[in-house]
Structures are given as structure tokens and as C-alpha cells.
């Protein structure tokens, strides 16, 4: 019979072994993830006002 608790403990043990193997601590992992997220979203927060000037308003034709 499948025991969910045993399965969860096994996954936790595997994660601990992986973290010990790569010498990744939880606080280092948090810093790593936050820096990756900052790098991914940096292009979205960059302001390109010159591109906004080139846009033209959309014209609506009413019947």
C-alpha cells in the first residue's frame, strides 16, 4: 500500500542530500532565487519613453 507520509519523507531526504552535495544552503537558495527573479524582470521595469513617442493612437470608425 502506498504511504504518502513515507513518500514525503523520502522526497525531503533526497532534497537534503542534493543540497548537501551542491553545498546549497536554504538562505543561499533564497538569495539565488531573488537575484534570478530580479534579472528576469529587469527588462520589464526599464523605461523606454522613446518607444512610446513613436506610437500612434488607434482610430475607431463608428458605423
From Swiss-Prot:
Any Pfam family hit: bCoV_NS6
Highest taxon, organism lineage: Viruses
Major localization class: host cell
Keywords (A to Z) from UniProt: Host endoplasmic reticulum, Host Golgi apparatus, Host membrane, Membrane, Virulence
InterPro entries in alphabetical order: NS6_bCoV
Gene Ontology, cellular component aspect: host cell endoplasmic reticulum membrane; host cell Golgi membrane; membrane
Compartments, as annotated in UniProt: Host endoplasmic reticulum membrane; Host Golgi apparatus membrane
Record field: transmembrane: none
Family note: Belongs to the coronaviruses accessory protein 6 family.
Role description: Could be a determinant of virus virulence. Seems to stimulate cellular DNA synthesis in vitro.
Extra facts: Bat coronavirus HKU3 is highly similar to SARS-CoV (SARS-like).
Protein name in the entry: ORF6 protein
Organism, scientific name: Bat coronavirus HKU3
Amino acid at each position: 500500500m502506498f504511504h504518502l507520509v513515507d513518500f514525503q519523507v523520502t522526497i525531503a531526504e533526497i532534497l537534503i542530500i542534493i543540497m548537501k552535495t551542491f553545498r546549497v544552503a536554504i538562505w543561499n537558495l533564497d538569495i539565488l532565487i531573488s537575484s534570478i527573479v530580479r534579472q528576469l524582470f529587469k527588462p520589464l521595469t526599464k523605461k523606454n519613453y522613446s518607444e512610446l513617442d513613436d506610437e500612434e493612437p488607434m482610430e475607431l470608425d463608428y458605423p
